[in-house]
Every structure is written in structure tokens, then in C-alpha cells.
Amino acid sequence: MTQELHIVGGGMAGSEAAWQAAHMGVDVVIHEMRPKVETFAHQTGNLAEMVCSNSFRSDDDEQNAVGLLHWEMRAANSLIMTTAGEHRLPAGGALAVDRDPFAESVTAKLKALPNVRVSYEEVTDLPTEGHWIFATGPLTSPALGEAIQRETGAERLAFFDAIAPIVYAESIDMSQAWMQSRYDKGETEEERTAYLNCPMTKDQYEAFIDALLAADKTEFHEGETAGYFDGCLPIEVMAERGRETLRHGPMKPVGLTNPHKPDEKAWAVVQLRRDNALGTLFNIVGFQTKMKYGAQTDVFRMIPGLENAKFARLGGIHRNTFLNSPTLLDHEMRLKSKPNIRFAGQVTGVEGYVESAAMGLLAGRMAAAEILGKDLPQVPQDSAMGALIHHITGGAEAKTFQPMNVNFGLFRPVEGLKGGRRGRKDRYKAYTDRAKVAWQEWLTNF
């Protein structure tokens, strides 16, 4: 029994993990609580049910990071990507799927494998023996959520995302912005320049507040009734409490001197903080929001220095369950306190169907290799897979860790290439060319 691989959760990650492990010759049991235990979002008991969008986003594997992830998954015999191709809908350069036939097909393919069994039952604890992958997604059941909290510590499991927008560093206008921590705090130069600052005049601030209050906003979905808590109040809710609230909160202008205009005191300052070790991504501090995406880009580009901002991720607050993976998981997604257990998918802090399935693919292969007594080299960081797993298991800042889509800001720079907009096409092609070579080389281990 201990040589079976148990996978809890039959979503994108769990289905992909099962497929990969089964094709390596390992016996797999998928534990899926639906339809016996329902969620507010799912409609069926099918595996890999898509409950939100039906899009896997861009399929461009030369100029887009998620398209590159598609390519890497296809190269690894991905169940999710193969089945998506079979049920593809017209969507321009994106990969959209007919969601019901897609889920039915994934379910049928897994059930047809002689070494895969689906057990429709809820798992409510973290076993101490056997090989397990927990891929329970953003709607992890309350009982299992409590078990994970007990094992990991309550402060390391979040039930609502407080997602601030993330901006590509190269798109920020540094002729208006500058690097400085408040009151120059810090022992090192890096600490004293940890924040990127965008100043506002009084007129700019008032116009920003007007736009913020008037912007289209989304409401909590049914089942997301816990409301807001002060630790992650949306900026528009803060603005509704008073026009000066933001100026005395995340946008307070104190302890900062604008080197571009040293004699002029800003009325308000928007701060951005480095979001990855490479310094290619910055998050807008305190700017979690329920504004609709189109409104976010319009409003946030009113910030001086961000007029041409390119966003790696837009903000939001919604129901989720995810670990502080940089603290809790090792480089193979094993729980450090219980290494017989791996986590995969959205619960690890990746965002999106494709990213979830990708982490399932890795977890399934890693768990199967462990069962078979096979050593694997680390996933190459220059691949999309490697950039993503490196981010969630150590590359991200643990104190501010939030779910992340795959994007080129997670990739190590390619030396000798132009920065900025003009060099972007060549730079992205260099990223994808390098990634494909690295990924194909890693696959030779199987």
C-alpha cells in the first residue's frame, strides 16, 4: 500500500499528477470529494472541471510565458494540454476549450488507465505514512483546511487573497520615480533603497481618488461572504471611508525625499516593493482591490511614473486557500514537516489553470520518481516550469507571498540583450529558446 501514490483533489493539478505518475508505472488513487461533498462553484463530479474561465490564455510559445508553459507541458505528454487541444474553441491566439467535453474526456482517460483508481471520498487529515499529493485547490474543504492549518501554523494558510498589482520594472518611468525606504531605514544600501516611490501632487491625488471611487468594481461571489478584514481592505473601501484615508495609510508621503524635486514635498506617495529576487517585478504596496481589470489599468496608470506601466498581474481579493510555500515546501514541493506529503496546484500559490496543471505535472513525476527510487536533478530555473517552481519554493519573498501567474519577470535575464520596449521581442524569444533547450534536457531523465 505504501508504494501507491494517493492524490487528493481531482482538479487540474491532481488530474495531471495522476496521469504523469501512472505513465511512469506507479499505481495511483485519486481521492475526489465531489459529488458527495459539494462546493459552491463546481457543478459536476467530473475531474478537471473548469469553474471560472474556459481559457488557458495565450498559446504563443515564443513571445508569451504561459504559451511557453503550454509548450513545455506538451513536450512532457501533458494530459491537460493534449485534451485541451482536442476540445479547442476558436479564440484567436489564445487556447480556449469546450469545458464540459474537456472535463468528461479527462475523467474518461484517467479511469481507462489500469493503474488509476478514483475514490469519491473526502480526505480530512494529513497522513503520516504513504506517498501523498494534496492538490485540493482554492476551494479546499473546511475540515482539510483545518488539518493543514494545524500542521503548518495558522499564519501560513490564507483563506482570502489580498493581491496587489504587480508591475514589470522595465515599464516604470524612473525620471519621475525613485528608490528609497522611509526615513532611509536599513543597515545596508539595499535595505535603504528597498521601495520604489511615485509622488503625487494634491491635484493628482484628488483626481486619483475620484477615479478610484467611480471605477467599476466586482462583488464577492456567492460563498465569499466572509467580508473584508482590516489586513487586506481594498483601496477603494479605504477611499470610501474618507478622501484622506489613503494619504494617511499606504500612500502617506512621510520620510521620503524626491531627488528629482528635492525642494517639493509630495502630497501623497505610492510605494512599490520588489516582488522577486531578480528585481524585475514590483508590487504596488497596499493596493489590493476589487476593481475590474480594465478599470485597474486606467486608474493605476494615473500614478506618476506608471503612465506606461505593464502589469504582470492585476489586483484582487477573492476566496482562496494557499500555503506560504517558500516557508513550508522544499524544492520538490514536499511539506518540510511531513515529507511524505507533497502539495501541487493552486494551493501552492500559483494562479491559473495552466500553472496549476504544470505544478501537478512536476509533483506527479517527482513523487513517482521517489517511489521508484530514482534521483532527479532540480527542474532547470531557465524553463517556465523551473521559474515557477523556484518562485513558489524559495524565490519569492515569504513575508509578502501571494499567488502568481507565470510571467517573464520570473526568468533570469539573458545577458547582452537590450532592455525596454524596443528589445522586448528579442528578449522574450531568447527566454523561450533557452527554456526549451533546458526543459528538453531535463526530460531526458525519464
From Swiss-Prot:
GO cellular component: cytosol
Keyword Transferase found: yes
SUPFAM superfamilies: FAD/NAD(P)-binding domain
A GO molecular-function descriptor: flavin adenine dinucleotide binding
Enzyme class: transferase
Residues given in the record as FAD binding sites: G9, G10, G11, M12, A13, G14
Segments passing through the bilayer: none
Keyword Acyltransferase: no
Entry's Gene Ontology BP terms: tRNA methylation; tRNA wobble uridine modification
Cofactor entry: FAD
Cell compartments where the protein resides: Cytoplasm
Record's signal peptide: none
Pfam families linked to this entry: GIDA (PF01134)
Family statement: Belongs to the MnmG family. TrmFO subfamily.
Role this protein plays: Catalyzes the folate-dependent formation of 5-methyl-uridine at position 54 (M-5-U54) in all tRNAs.
Name the record gives this protein: Methylenetetrahydrofolate--tRNA-(uracil-5-)-methyltransferase TrmFO
Organism field: Ruegeria sp. (strain TM1040) (Silicibacter sp.)
Gene: trmFO
